[in-house]
């Protein structure tokens, strides 16, 4: 039977519930347990797919093609379980399902209410998402006291009663601020946060106290006294220099022992040797490179969360400190390529819309002409094709129909038909809804032997995740190839371009898929590892 750990947050948002939850999950997995994780988002959007990156941050794409919260990226980086569409749902998704049932008449004329209909649907989805795992950690987004969170908190209150105290526990993250002028940490915000929880029938079993200073024994004892939580279950979690230290921090305070004892689970001790190796490689690099990341959402770096982490992982696997120089593509449009001088490699990530595209194209041209290693992802591949068409082939009006529908050389256009991961045919038009209509999820890609990308993967066939609705225009592809553009990867059916490379260049690879979604700190990712190796070679050549 599955045991549930419900995770809530109080006092302020952005305390790191996702990372703390994933770290505990990593320890439990290291003890031999089958672990999964869920994220419940209280916002009304059906999913984050159409939300602005400036508001929501990254949209993480699962293997089965769900557009989900970025916390699922943390989950997959910390545990081996692959997330699916069942591991993340929103208020909007819940209401959409309940209202569809009401329209069908499934409720037989009953008055639809938050309790029981909405809460029952939330509980059903939690149980479904947990599957057959030994332990499921269920993170509720937002902060206790938010009006949007109330149905979710009520649902987990009910579920705790239904499954019993031996199968459910509540872990609450709070802020314990350090007052420098007083030289002490303050526990009152935590006390009030727990009071808020208890007022709706939820008693925490574990408190994770977030602070920029260690929470001393006397403060933890005081918190335990006023919150009715066991003293050993009051955990101090201060800021660390790498998030991959957190499993060891929680383990050292006995959190996993407390959970295992509480649930009556029989399992081995935690083997955290893999995480020790990750931390050692992260904190003790032997080399250093600087890579320019040219994007359009630089005001909120969470928009590139998985990509930034993937670059860190590549640094770990290469024992190299990767310094990312974040450059807004609009700044290149205004200030020129001087912003790129001195870097060891250039990375252009995905994005949507016309703003900043010309700056990305300029960055591609700089990388190609100056033989600087280049990695383009999604839009980063499309702008590489546009740049090649303009500056190598002389098609000065070359563009994507996303940006210019009147272009005389639309080298990138809307995909109107493709096969999804199950083999079903998907059809789209310009009039299709934006939400959930892209080519999403894991797809096969066939790599050309002898190419740079094949050298990285050392495989003929790979599977990577996608999120796009535009592709290289097959009608103009023969002319692009004839002019020297190397097509080194195609979709499983051969219909779509997946990877392009520049010839006579030390390392220039651009892919339509998103490899960052499958990179992990313990395993890295072959494409990013190859990219950092190329950057390191460039750095050593300059030296």
Curated annotation (Swiss-Prot):
GO molecular function annotation: ATP binding; CTP synthase activity; glutaminase activity; identical protein binding; metal ion binding
Family to which this protein belongs: Belongs to the CTP synthase family.
Miscellaneous note of the record: CTPSs have evolved a hybrid strategy for distinguishing between UTP and CTP. The overlapping regions of the product feedback inhibitory and substrate sites recognize a common feature in both compounds, the triphosphate moiety. To differentiate isosteric substrate and product pyrimidine rings, an additional pocket far from the expected kinase/ligase catalytic site, specifically recognizes the cytosine and ribose portions of the product inhibitor.
Function field: Catalyzes the ATP-dependent amination of UTP to CTP with either L-glutamine or ammonia as the source of nitrogen. Regulates intracellular CTP levels through interactions with the four ribonucleotide triphosphates.
GO BP annotations, alphabetical order: 'de novo' CTP biosynthetic process; pyrimidine nucleobase biosynthetic process
GO annotation, cellular component aspect: cytosol
Domain of life: Bacteria
Enzyme Commission (EC) number: 6.3.4.2
Binding, UTP: 13, 186-191, 222
Entry protein name: CTP synthase
Activity regulation field: Allosterically activated by GTP, when glutamine is the substrate; GTP has no effect on the reaction when ammonia is the substrate. The allosteric effector GTP functions by stabilizing the protein conformation that binds the tetrahedral intermediate(s) formed during glutamine hydrolysis. Inhibited by the product CTP, via allosteric rather than competitive inhibition.
Subunit structure comment from the entry: Homotetramer.
Annotated L-glutamine binding sites: 351, 379-382, 402, 469
Pfam families linked: CTP_synth_N, GATase
Active-site feature positions: 378, 514, 516
Entry keyword annotation includes Transmembrane helix: no
Record-linked PANTHER family: CTP SYNTHASE, CTP SYNTHASE-RELATED
Domain (Glutamine amidotransferase type-1): residue spans on this chain: 290-541
Residues annotated as binding Mg(2+): 71, 139
């Amino acid at each position: 039977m599955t045991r549930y750990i419900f995770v809530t947050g109080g006092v302020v948002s952005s305390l790191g519930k996702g990372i703390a939850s994933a770290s505990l999950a990593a320890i439990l997995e290291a003890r031999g347990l089958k672990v999964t994780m869920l994220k419940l988002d209280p916002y009304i959007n059906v999913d984050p797919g159409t939300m602005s990156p400036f508001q929501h941050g990254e949209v993480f794409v699962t293997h089965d093609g769900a557009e989900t919260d970025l916390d699922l990226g943390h989950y997959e980086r910390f545990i081996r379980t692959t997330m699916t569409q069942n591991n993340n749902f929103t208020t909007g998704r819940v209401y959409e399902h309940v209202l569809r049932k009401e329209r069908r008449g499934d409720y037989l004329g009953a008055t639809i209410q938050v309790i029981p209909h909405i809460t029952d649907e939330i509980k059903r989805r939690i149980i479904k998402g947990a599957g057959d795992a030994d332990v499921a950690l269920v993170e509720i987004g937002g902060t206790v006291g938010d009006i949007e969170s109330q149905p979710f908190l009520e649902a987990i209150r009910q579920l705790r009663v239904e499954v019993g105290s031996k199968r459910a526990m509540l872990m609450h993250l709070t802020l314990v601020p350090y007052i420098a002028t007083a030289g002490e940490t303050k526990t009152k915000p935590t006390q009030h946060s727990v009071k808020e929880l208890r007022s709706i029938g939820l008693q925490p079993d574990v408190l994770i106290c977030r602070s920029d200073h260690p929470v001393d024994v006397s403060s933890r004892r005081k918190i335990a006294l006023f919150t009715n939580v066991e003293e050993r279950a009051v955990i101090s979690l201060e800021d660390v220099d790498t998030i991959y230290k957190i499993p060891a921090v929680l383990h050292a305070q006995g959190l996993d022992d407390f959970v295992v004892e509480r649930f009556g689970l029989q399992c081995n001790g935690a083997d955290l040797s893999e995480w020790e190796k990750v931390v050692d490689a992260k904190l003790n690099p032997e080399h250093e490179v600087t890579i320019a990341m040219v994007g359009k959402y630089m005001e909120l770096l969470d928009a590139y969360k998985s990509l930034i982490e993937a670059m860190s992982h590549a640094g770990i696997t290469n024992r190299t400190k990767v310094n990312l120089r974040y450059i807004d593509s609009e700044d290149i449009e205004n200030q020129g390529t001087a912003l790129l001088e001195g870097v060891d490699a250039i990375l252009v990530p995905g994005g949507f819309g016309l703003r900043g595209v010309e700056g990305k194209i300029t960055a591609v041209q700089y990388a190609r002409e100056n033989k600087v290693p280049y990695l383009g992802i999604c839009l980063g591949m499309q702008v590489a094709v546009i740049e090649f068409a303009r500056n190598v082939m002389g098609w000065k009006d070359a563009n994507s129909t996303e940006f210019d529908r009147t272009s005389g050389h639309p080298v990138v256009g809307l995909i109107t038909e493709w096969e999804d991961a199950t083999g079903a045919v998907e059809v789209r038009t310009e009039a299709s809804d934006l939400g959930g209509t892209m080519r999403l999820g894991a797809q096969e890609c066939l790599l050309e032997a002898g190419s740079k990308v094949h050298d990285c993967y050392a495989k003929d066939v790979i599977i990577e995740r996608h999120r796009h609705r535009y592709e290289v225009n097959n009608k103009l592809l023969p002319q692009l190839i004839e002019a020297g553009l190397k097509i080194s990867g195609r979709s499983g059916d051969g219909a779509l371009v997946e990877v392009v490379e520049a010839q006579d260049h030390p390392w220039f690879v651009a892919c339509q898929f998103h490899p960052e979604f499958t990179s992990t700190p313990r395993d890295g990712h072959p494409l990013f590892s190859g990219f950092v190796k190329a950057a390191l070679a460039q750095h050593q050549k300059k030296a």
